[in-house]
Structures are given as structure tokens and as C-alpha cells.
């Protein structure tokens, strides 16, 4: 579960700049991009389930995507498009901590290779490569991985200026029904403050101090459900 240490982490680093990048006038601080977590080289046994994880801290909000041997396998280069439209012309923080997880449900020889995690805040990119080798006795993999949804991406922490709109995001690798809670409150599309998208995004308009806190995104299918947590921290304009 994300604790208040995450707030300190983002606030202390939000003023650091990305090398050789000019400030964005709309941002309330210098651009930032850094890894918070990188995947390790791994030896995996045939038939084993494994997960590679990667994390980023950044402003503007970073996206994370994965490549295997130079081919895109998961993720997107752009994120937060709707939030950017709603906040057009405003000063923004647009700072976040983001996590991404790439899952292999049953390892085979084709899963061996160089996995590259790429983080991108729209101004610069950073890359990290982890080499995975699949070996041992070969085994047959089931055709279907019937289970609760796997949440492959979360915005773990968001920092945004009060009165702006903010997007809290979760993603799943499979078709999923999404719901969002703040504490015990189930959030619904009310046409004014909250808007939820099939992709897993929750948009909150005109945020205020009362919106600060933990939000739970829940992915659900016929086999079960999985929940992830994000934290929203509204700030004052500088």
C-alpha cells in the first residue's frame, strides 16, 4: 500500500530538471524523469510464470512501455490526453509516480531475450534493459490463463494543482470491468465531477483539498477481481 513517504519523494524531486531540457511554461516546476524501479536479469524455467516490473517518477506524467528484442509488446507512448485537454492553458503540476508490470503466464523459448523498459515524459526518454533466459525441461502451457485480471499499469501517486482536472489510471492486459472507490465510497459517472472510461481511467474535475487520499481501482472478470491503490495530493498554485 502506498504511504505518505511517496508524497515526500515526489515533492522533494519535483524541482529537479531533466538534463538539457527547457522548462515548460505550463508546469509549476522543472521537468523531471527518473526510474524508481527497474527489472533485473532473470533465468526462468520453462512453464514458470514471471513478472517484470518497472517504475518512473516524472513531470510531465510519464508513460511506460515495453519492448522485447526491439518490438513493442506492451504500453503506450502517450497518456493523460483527456486531462491535458481539460487543463489546456492552465498551470499544472502533472507530476506522478507510475508503475508498469509485464507478465508472462507460462514461459517458453520465445520469451527469452532483451526486455527494454522505456519511460517517457514527452520531453525525454530513459531506457533500461533486462535479459531473460528461459531454460530447463520443456513443458506444455495451457491455452488459457483463467484467473482474475492482472493490472499491468497504475499511476501510484498524483500531484496536481487544486481546481484542475486530474486523471487516475489503471490498465489491464485483458478485457476488464472497472470500478473506482474513494474509501468506502463507490464513484460513479455523475456528469460533473467524476468520469470513468473503459480503459481504466478515472477523471476528477475541479479537484480540491477534500479530494486528497487513496483511491482504489478494481479490475473484475468472471474469475475474480484485483485491486490497486493510488494516492491523489492536491496542491496550491505557485
From Swiss-Prot:
Entry-listed glycosylation sites: 40, 43, 137, 206, 216
GO annotation (BP), single: cell development
Origin superkingdom: Eukaryota
PROSITE patterns attached to this UniProt entry: IG_LIKE (PS50835)
Disulfide bond sites: 54-117, 170-217
Pfam families: I-set
Record's function text: Probably not involved in maintaining the position of ASI and ASH head neuron cell bodies and ventral nerve cord axons of PVQ, PVP, RMEV, AVK and HSN neurons.
CC per GO annotation: extracellular region
Signal peptide: 1-17
Disruption phenotype: No visible phenotype. No defect in the positioning of ASI and ASH neuron cell bodies. No defect in the positioning of PQV, PVP, RMEV, HSN and AVK axons in the ventral nerve cord. In a zig-1, zig-3, zig-4 or zig-5 or zig-8 mutant background, cell body positioning of ASI and ASH head neurons is normal.
Tissue spec: Expressed in PVT neurons and weakly in some head neurons.
Location within or outside the cell: Secreted
Alphabetical list of Gene3D superfamilies matching this protein: Immunoglobulins
Keyword Signal: yes
Family annotation (InterPro entries): Ig-like_dom (IPR007110), Ig-like_dom_sf (IPR036179), Ig-like_fold (IPR013783), Ig_I-set (IPR013098), Ig_sub (IPR003599), Ig_sub2 (IPR003598)
Residues annotated as domain Ig-like C2-type: 31-130, 149-230
Source organism of this protein record: Caenorhabditis elegans
Name of the protein in its database record: Zwei Ig domain protein zig-2
TM ranges: none
Alphabetical keyword list: Disulfide bond, Glycoprotein, Immunoglobulin domain, Repeat, Secreted, Signal
Amino acid at each position: 500500500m502506498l504511504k505518505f513517504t511517496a508524497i515526500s519523494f515526489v515533492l522533494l524531486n519535483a524541482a529537479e530538471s531533466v538534463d538539457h531540457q527547457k522548462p515548460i511554461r505550463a508546469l509549476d516546476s522543472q521537468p523531471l524523469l527518473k526510474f524508481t524501479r527497474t527489472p533485473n536479469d532473470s533465468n526462468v524455467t520453462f512453464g514458470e510464470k514471471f513478472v517484470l516490473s518497472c517504475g518512473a517518477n516524472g513531470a510531465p506524467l510519464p508513460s511506460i512501455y515495453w519492448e522485447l528484442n526491439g518490438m513493442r509488446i506492451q504500453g503506450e507512448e502517450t497518456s493523460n490526453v483527456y486531462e491535458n485537454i481539460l487543463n489546456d492553458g492552465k498551470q499544472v503540476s502533472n507530476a506522478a509516480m507510475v508503475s508498469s508490470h509485464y507478465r508472462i503466464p507460462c514461459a517458453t523459448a520465445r520469451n527469452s531475450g532483451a526486455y527494454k523498459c522505456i519511460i517517457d515524459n514527452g520531453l525525454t526518454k530513459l531506457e533500461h534493459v533486462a535479459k531473460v533466459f528461459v531454460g530447463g525441461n520443456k513443458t506444455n502451457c495451457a491455452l488459457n490463463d483463467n484467473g482474475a485480471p492482472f493490472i499491468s499499469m497504475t499511476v501510484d501517486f498524483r500531484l496536481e494543482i487544486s481546481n484542475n482536472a486530474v486523471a487516475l489510471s489503471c490498465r489491464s492486459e485483458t478485457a476488464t470491468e472497472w470500478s473506482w472507490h474513494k474509501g468506502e465510497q463507490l464513484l460513479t459517472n455523475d456528469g460533473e465531477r467524476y468520469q470513468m472510461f473503459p480503459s481504466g481511467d478515472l477523471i476528477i474535475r475541479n479537484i480540491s483539498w477534500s479530494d486528497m487520499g487513496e483511491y482504489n481501482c478494481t479490475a473484475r472478470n468472471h474469475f475474480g477481481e484485483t485491486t490497486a491503490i493510488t494516492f491523489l495530493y492536491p496542491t496550491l498554485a505557485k
